[in-house]
Amino acid sequence: MQKITVLCVGKLKEAFYEQAVKEYEKRLSRCCKLELLELPEQRPGDEPSEAEIRQALKKEAALVEQKLPKGGALIAMCIEGQELSSVALSQKMQQLAARGASQLTFLIGSSFGLDEDLKKKADLRLSMSPMTFPHHLARVMLLEQIYRAYQIEAGTKYHK
């Protein structure tokens, strides 16, 4: 069974997001070994400068580096990433597994995004949409898409 790690910078605060995450955790438990990791968001202040934002992202990146699993493939969720259909994501996950990536790590940054060096280390940069979403909602959307990818691979009726 493939291992999926979803590493998120920032804690879920709203109960409705937590409920949705729990639902997809339950569904995914039949498809993969899922690990959800949360790291604290660095808050640079109310009206931070670009330099303060970069510094906060560097601090977050250092925390992320400590928690990144060894081996496997790293998928950075970022707005400038590649947009894939659900079917294409399923195929990409299968391709990575076929190339020996027994573990996939999806990385969701804080409200300021991800440090550039982390993005460069990624095997794939993935964008959900050209639209902007709260990173808490992105977590739910990503879990749903991972679940959908497994259902596509299995040929179930979930994906229509």
PLM feature spans:
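N-terminal beta1-alpha1 ligand-phosphate binding loop
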Residues: 1-28
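Short glycine-rich anion-binding loops that position phosphate/pyrophosphate groups of nucleotides
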Residues: 12, 79-82, 110-113
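Structured adenosyl-cofactor binding patch, chiefly the S-adenosyl-L-methionine
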Residues: 112, 116-160
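Conserved strand-to-helix beginnings and helix N-cap segments that scaffold or border functional pockets
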Residues: 17-21, 86-90, 119, 139
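Short hydrophobic segments within beta-strands
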Residues: 7-9, 37-39, 77, 107
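Loop/turn-to-beta-strand initiation segments
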Residues: 3, 102-106
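Conserved beta-strand segments of alpha/beta enzyme cores
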Residues: 33-35, 124
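S-adenosyl-L-methionine/SAH cofactor-binding core of RNA-modifying enzymes
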Residues: 34, 40-102
